[in-house]
Amino acid sequence: MIMRMMNIADFDETSIEIIGDNSQHSKQSSNENNREVVLKFAAKHQDIRAVGIMLKESVGLGLATPPGLSGFVGGRPKPSPIVRLFSFLIDKDQVNVTIDNGSSKNEIKIPPSDEFDLNSIEQTTAPDFEDANEKFVDVPLIKVAYGRSGDKGNKANIGIISRDPKFYPAICNFLDEKVVKDCFADFLEGSVERYFLPGSNSINFILNDVLGGGGPASLRNDPQGKAYAQILLDQMIPIPEKLLS
């Protein structure tokens, strides 16, 4: 109502997360036994006044909240600008390379090289997996693998490493792009890529357009996807029972 009176358009983007109630776990039901959760909300707008109005209204949390609700941040937050990362390629002959050793600067000439052919890379395939007459047991992925994740702009990178080489073929067989896509369905706007690294018994997943802009451009509480590996490790995966004994 206030924004309408001031002829200010609606927010460009909003984010509401209930931390502590599986807000990061796609398609998973809430935990009704939770006794404490944190409500986080954020918004984007081209007019700083709109964000200021929202933050001013949030002051009411410290003055007249419903029973059982409290605001724990110190003072009223201030609107902050959105900073985005834009990466691109440029011909090396357009960039001067200089070495500065403190006392002098020396320009280095880098001769042009042949253009790299992406098609020359041979992608490794999944290892053979024989599942005939096998009895399977569903276990959390964390029981048979380690995980680590991070970001590059608006992409998330998840590495999964088998705890034992014997689990690797089964993990590769069942942990595919669809499983990962379903796991992050609430966030994922792009595709999922899978790469096999048999030398380390691991898989690398790249999730495109999954971080809401990534870094300071994202409104989420995990804009760098640092918890994504742990979320994926919660997924159930079928493993031959004989390998678990």
Feature-to-residue mapping (PLM):
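C-terminal beta-rich recognition modules with glycine/proline-rich loops and embedded aromatic residues
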Residues: N119-S120, I158, P169, A217
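Helix-rich interaction surfaces within compact, conserved domain-sized segments
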Residues: G190-S245
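Short conserved micro-motifs at the rims of enzyme active sites and ligand-binding pockets
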Residues: Q28-S29, G52-M54, I171-N173, G215-L219
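Bergerat-fold GHKL/Histidine-kinase-like ATPase
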Residues: L141-I142
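Extended active-site and interfacial segments that coordinate phosphate-rich ligands
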Residues: E57, L175-F184, R220-A229
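C-terminal non-catalytic interaction/assembly regions of soluble proteins
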Residues: M1-N133, D138, K152, I161, ...
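Hydrophobic/aromatic-rich, well-ordered segments within soluble, folded domains that form packed cores
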Residues: A145-C183
